[in-house]
Amino acid sequence: VYITGSSEKTWSSPLNAHAGGFDTFIAKLNNSGIRQWHTFMGGSDHDNGKGIAIDGSDNIYIAGYSYATWGSPINAFAGYFDAFVVKLNSSGTRQWHTFMGGSSWDYGKSIAVDGSGNIYVAGYSNRTWGSPVNAHSGNVEAFSVKLNGNGALQWNTFMGSDDSDYGKAI
């Protein structure tokens, strides 16, 4: 059993230290609910894990959003709030992470992994970014993203009206 979210302070003995502000946390529980490990990731400001998926090799994928850059991402932080994806191995060690978004706010809310190791994220943005299949056309647009197993962006697309549209699950 895995859980993700955000925490304002450190607790217990994490694999990776709390950096400050709100950090994303990931915890592994056994079948009896006993925590096996937990780790933090993020920068000195607001980082929030919102979605979690596990692949056939027990790798853990987290989707969320960050207010500042951290670590050495595949794709750089672009500004304000950016969506992110993090891949951890089954022991909780970060394998890679990447940011997705533009100069305004972009929120990753949900994540899924297919049998070939491709990663899909749903979320929402209030500005365009990348080279989308369908252009951003409104105030807030739902988005979907496909990353390959190494975290490289394969495509992104926007959908919705000229008002507010929110992608929250995939």
Language-model-derived ranges and their functions:
Residues V1-I170:
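A sequence-level/structural motif corresponding to short, flexible coil/turn segments enriched
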